[in-house]
């Protein structure tokens, strides 16, 4: 939310400062499933306007970021005793496709034999059929996608800093906000002044508002979700979709040479969470029941874990005590605007809807009297076609793709453009000067040496985790 808000406002002429207590995308975003989807699960609760909005947002992202966001098939197996018959869910998938303006490939009905023929790794012993439909995913990861927004914001003269914590904001008699900031690495404190405050602290929006004595119409409740990264389950580029023992959607998501399995949905009271033994066992039990593996997955197969919270939006006075009320909560976002104090809070939301959040914040800021001189300027999307053509021309002239290592998952030209956009042209110059810069940094990975130099110079890395976990896919 903060990254798109900063990019949209800076691109349209506002003077913007973006402050992050940790690293950019270092909390909820880095723990996401990397899926860009239209909310098919909300079909069951008849939230068709939300599904329509999310489908349109998904389509918009697919058009705007063709290198970074790709359509992917979701392959769904249903078992005996499921609450709906397969053909009914297939009809729902057809409706989902129609709600999304038929933008993706059409759904397909599957009988157990077809499921077994296409994905023999799926246990079809209790299968009653299934279906296949399309949504989208981030080819790299959520954290990298967010950082590319940060990079765009900086190119529009936004001041963006990580590892700087807000200690709270107060508004003086002249109507100006004063925010105390602290460097979390050396303890240095300083003050910044602004006409408007935008609280885009994700799961910590409520806590930040308390520090600044700000009351709002909405608040957050939290759902913990975990994913386990395990050795590759299938080399087919599709998401395997099941319904877990608790009835929720459950995925096995391709992740390069690995597979990410999850997720859980556990009500928690704080954004600070961790993976428990119960979480691990739930995921392992569910995936092992639904796959035909030579050897069941165990804790020794876990390469890494992801654990984060979904900030769910409710009215400030609501309780949502029952499980039924809890399960009906969606990932809709809300923007609270305090016109008197010139304060904005962004609650909830998901990656799929990020461009809408940026547009809504621009409208809200104008509502507060801030002039945006370039209010119609497009602030998102990949670089113009002319820049891409120049990049590809240089790629051809230097024979870049011939330098791609034998174990790479894609050619260098595709990878560098997706990750760096127009800045990839500078990487070509580095490789021309020294072809060794096109060699893998670590054998078995796609990351090449010139990218390390790029990261050190231009990607605001403070800790090794920033590089390993969020800027690269190592």
What is the predicted function of each stretch?
Residues 1-2:
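Hydrophobic/small residue at the entry helix of a nucleotide-binding pocket
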Residues 6, 10-11, 152:
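Gly/Ala-rich phosphate-binding loop of Rossmann-like dinucleotide-binding domains
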Residues 10-31:
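Glycine-rich FAD pyrophosphate-binding loop
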Residues 34-118:
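Dinucleotide-binding Rossmann-like beta1-alpha1 core, especially the glycine-rich loop
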Residues 107, 127, 142-148, 152, ...:
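C-terminal catalytic lobe of FAD-dependent flavoproteins
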Residues 162-177:
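A conserved short coil-to-beta-strand element within the FAD-binding core of flavoproteins
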Residues 185-196:
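Core beta-strand elements of the Rossmann-like FAD/NAD(P) dinucleotide-binding domain
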Residues 194-206, 233, 265, 351:
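Glycine-/small-residue-rich beta->alpha transition segments that form the dinucleotide
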């Amino acid at each position: 939310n903060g990254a798109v808000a900063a990019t949209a406002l800076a691109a349209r002429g506002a003077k913007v400062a973006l402050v992050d207590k940790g690293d950019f995308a270092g909390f909820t975003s880095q723990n996401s499933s990397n899926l860009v989807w239209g909310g098919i699960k909300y079909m069951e609760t008849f939230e068709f306007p939300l599904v329509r909005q999310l489908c349109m947002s998904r389509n918009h992202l697919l058009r705007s970021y063709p290198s970074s966001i790709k359509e992917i098939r979701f392959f769904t197996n249903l078992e005996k005793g499921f609450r709906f018959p397969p053909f009914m869910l297939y009809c729902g998938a057809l409706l989902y496709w129609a709600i999304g303006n038929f933008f993706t490939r059409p759904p397909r009905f599957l009988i157990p034999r077809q499921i077994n023929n296409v994905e023999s790794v799926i246990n079809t012993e209790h299968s009653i059929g299934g279906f296949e439909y399309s949504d989208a995913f981030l080819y790299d990861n959520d954290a990298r996608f967010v950082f590319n927004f940060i990079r765009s914001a900086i190119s529009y003269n936004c001041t963006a800093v990580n590892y700087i914590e807000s200690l709270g904001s107060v508004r003086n008699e002249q109507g100006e906000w004063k925010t105390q900031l602290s460097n979390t690495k050396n303890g240095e404190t300083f003050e910044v002044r602004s006409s408007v405050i935008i609280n885009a602290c994700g799961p910590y929006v409520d806590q930040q508002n308390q520090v600044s004595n700000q009351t709002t119409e909405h608040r957050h409740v939290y759902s913990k979700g975990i994913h386990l990264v395990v050795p590759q389950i299938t080399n087919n580029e599709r998401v395997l979709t099941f319904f877990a023992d608790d009835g929720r959607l459950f995925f096995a998501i391709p992740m390069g040479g690995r597979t990410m399995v999850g997720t859980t949905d556990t009500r928690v009271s704080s954004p600070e969470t961790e993976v428990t033994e119960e979480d691990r066992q739930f995921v392992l039990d569910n995936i092992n029941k639904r796959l035909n593996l030579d050897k069941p997955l165990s804790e020794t197969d876990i390469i890494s874990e992801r654990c984060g919270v979904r900030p769910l939006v409710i009215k400030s006075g609501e309780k949502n005590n029952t499980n039924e009320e809890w399960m009906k909560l969606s990932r809709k976002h809300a923007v609270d605007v305090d016109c008197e104090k010139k304060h904005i809070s962004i609650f909830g939301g998901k990656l799929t809807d990020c461009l809408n959040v940026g547009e809504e914040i621009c409208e809200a800021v104008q509502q507060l009297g801030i002039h945006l001189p370039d209010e119609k300027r497009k602030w998102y999307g990949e670089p113009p076609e002319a820049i891409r053509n120049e990049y590809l021309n240089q790629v051809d002239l230097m024979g870049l793709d011939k330098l791609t290592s034998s174990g790479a998952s894609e050619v260098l030209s595709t990878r560098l453009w997706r990750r760096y956009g127009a800045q990839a042209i500078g990487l070509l110059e580095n490789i021309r000067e020294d072809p060794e810069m096109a060699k893998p940094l670590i054998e078995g990975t796609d990351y090449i040496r010139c990218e390390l130099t790029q990261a050190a110079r231009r990607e605001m890395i403070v800790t090794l985790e920033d590089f390993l976990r969020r800027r690269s896919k190592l």
